[in-house]
């Protein structure tokens, strides 16, 4: 009976001491993994930041191109006198000599195409 108790006590002491070692090892492994995870997260965050900056640059470039190209210079509306040599009629309008009602004005006007 004493041998059983001694054996049990010996196994218990070994289990506790090895368990403590495993606990310390587990703690060290967890710290290493979290440090690696942080570095991976930092790297992933850095890559994501680069991609977002590239997208932002593309969007800003497109916006600036749109604002330069899409804005129409001041134009003359329909039925407004225009210069024959330098017509500034808005898009969809043409600078033409009036047919009936404006013959006496001797001027060109913007009309729809």
Swiss-Prot record:
Pfam families: Toxin_22
Intrachain S-S bonds: 75-90, 82-95, 89-110
Cellular localization per UniProt: Secreted
Main location as per UniProt: secreted
Residues in the signal sequence: 1-21
GO CC term, one of those recorded: extracellular region
Region (Disordered): 61-83
Distribution of this protein across tissues and organs: Expressed by the venom gland.
InterPro entries the UniProt entry points to: Toxin_22
Keywords, in A-Z order: Disulfide bond, Ion channel impairing toxin, Knottin, Secreted, Signal, Toxin
Maturation-removed propeptide residues: 22-74
Molecular function per GO: sodium channel inhibitor activity; toxin activity
Domain notes: The presence of a 'disulfide through disulfide knot' structurally defines this protein as a knottin.
Family note: Belongs to the neurotoxin 14 (magi-1) family. 01 (HNTX-16) subfamily.
Function in brief: Probable ion channel inhibitor.
Protein's recorded name: U11-theraphotoxin-Hhn1a
Taxonomic path: Eukaryota, Metazoa, Ecdysozoa, Arthropoda, Chelicerata
